[in-house]
């Protein structure tokens, strides 16, 4: 008995040491990848971030001058509330502090990649992966091209929200594996941070995965005659969700009220006669303008299947990635098959020819990761696998 206890303690110590090693490795990778910019305090030129800073400058200046927080600004749209420009509430100060700790206090944008890795690392541990396997999965997940694309575009709220999705799933997994306290705490905290990151659209899409997982675990529980345990786990998760919503109630309510007066939720009272009978909400073409084309989905494993990116950053400017820069065009020019004038003509056309207006790059997860996904589909058994597979296919369909 004592020998078994010693072995258990030894295993726990090894796992703890492994987790610490993994955290250090992830922090180093994050800093090295963005070296020397993150270390030197250099700032990326991010369109959405720059625009957001400009929009919130008037409100920030008012706070610095008076010590009071304003909920109105004249900096855009002839005046509007600051609910979605610079949402800040006394109730979220603790949440903001937790976010900094979660990013290990690393300089931006290294902290963002670290947050993405640590979140997936926690999820892998919930699935009982060894620490080094969890570390590999975390690195592979975080270095999907999409995350770097949205960092470059300045979609920081979206990125932050996505960093808390994996640990929220981890909490769900632990709850359905009867680790109610651990799962409930992790799920509540991660969901709270997710909502506090203020990109509710991502949380909305994540809800589809939550439902799929709950159904998958229910089917599993029915087969194993453990429906009572499923009910307890679901109850714990429901409480976690309520706590997360309650912690973010001020911002959620303000967003709900404000949405009624926006193009997304309705119409402003200031309308023309032509607008009175217009349908509520966004136009379908507007909503789907940045949707992936069906054949463009192949970029998950073949990055340049639709030509790659439209532009690339170069010395603080965005440069068009034209057809003239392709090896084929240069070979044709060098062989005399096209004239210099024709070559210059190619310089006016982008390499990207997908369905989106433009793109900063393809969403590429990697052939190795995709191969592991297929292997998992074959080797893993049970209803939960099928639920996750259905959710994956649904996400692809929604992306079109």
Regions of interest found by a model, annotated:
Residues 1-35, 232-241, 374:
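Start-transfer (signal-anchor) and selected internal transmembrane alpha helices
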Residues 2-14, 173-184, 215-232, 378-383:
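Membrane-interface junctions at the ends of membrane-embedded or membrane-associated helices
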Residues 13, 222-235, 322-346, 372-396, ...:
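Membrane-interface helix-loop-helix junctions at transmembrane boundaries of multi-pass membrane enzymes
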Residues 14-21, 99-108, 129-137, 183:
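Membrane-interface starts of transmembrane alpha-helices
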Residues 19-27, 228-256, 265, 272-275, ...:
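Hydrophobic alpha-helical membrane-interfacial segments at the cytosolic entry of transmembrane helices
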Residues 29-120, 127, 139-162, 276-365, ...:
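Membrane-interface coil-to-helix junctions
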Residues 38-51, 255-271:
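Alpha-helical transmembrane signal-anchor/signal-peptide segments
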Residues 114-126, 132-221, 233-255:
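Membrane-embedded helix bundles of polyisoprenyl
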């Amino acid at each position: 008995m004592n020998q078994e206890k010693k072995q258990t303690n030894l295993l726990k110590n090894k796992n703890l040491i492994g987790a610490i090693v993994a955290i250090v490795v992830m922090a180093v990778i994050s800093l090295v990848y963005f070296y020397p910019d993150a270390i030197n305090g250099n700032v990326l030129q991010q369109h959405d971030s720059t625009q957001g800073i400009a929009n919130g400058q008037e409100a920030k200046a008012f706070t610095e001058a008076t010590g009071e927080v304003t909920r109105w600004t004249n900096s855009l749209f002839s005046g509007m509330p600051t609910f979605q420009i610079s949402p800040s509430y006394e109730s979220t100060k603790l949440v903001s502090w937790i976010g900094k700790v979660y990013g290990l206090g690393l300089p931006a944008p290294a902290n963002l990649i670290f947050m993405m890795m640590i979140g997936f690392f926690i999820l892998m541990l919930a699935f009982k992966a060894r620490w080094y396997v969890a570390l590999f999965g975390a690195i592979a997940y975080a270095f999907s091209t999409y995350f770097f694309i949205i960092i470059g575009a300045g979609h920081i709220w979206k990125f932050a929200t996505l960093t808390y999705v994996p640990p929220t799933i981890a909490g769900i997994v632990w709850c359905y594996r009867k680790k109610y306290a651990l799962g409930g705490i992790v799920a509540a905290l991660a969901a709270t941070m997710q909502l506090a990151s203020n990109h509710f659209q991502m949380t909305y899409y994540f809800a589809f995965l939550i439902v799929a997982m709950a159904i998958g675990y229910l089917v599993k529980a029915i087969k194993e005659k453990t429906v009572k345990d499923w009910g307890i786990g679901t109850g714990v998760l429901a409480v976690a969700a309520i706590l997360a919503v309650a912690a973010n109630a001020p911002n959620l309510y303000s967003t709900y009220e404000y949405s009624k007066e926006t193009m997304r939720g309705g119409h402003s009272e200031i309308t023309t006669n032509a607008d009175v009978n217009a349908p509520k909400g966004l136009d379908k073409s507007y909503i789907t303008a940045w949707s992936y084309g069906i054949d463009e989905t192949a970029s998950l494993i073949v990055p340049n299947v639709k030509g790659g990116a439209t532009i690339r950053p170069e010395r603080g400017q965005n440069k068009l990635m034209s057809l003239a820069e392709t090896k084929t065009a240069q070979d044709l020019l060098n062989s005399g098959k096209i004239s210099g004038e024709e070559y210059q003509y190619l310089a006016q056309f982008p390499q990207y020819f997908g369905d989106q207006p433009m793109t900063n790059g393809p969403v590429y997860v990697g052939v190795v990761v995709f191969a592991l996904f297929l292997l998992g589909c074959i080797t893993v058994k049970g209803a939960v696998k099928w639920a996750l597979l259905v959710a994956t296919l649904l996400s692809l369909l929604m992306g079109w």
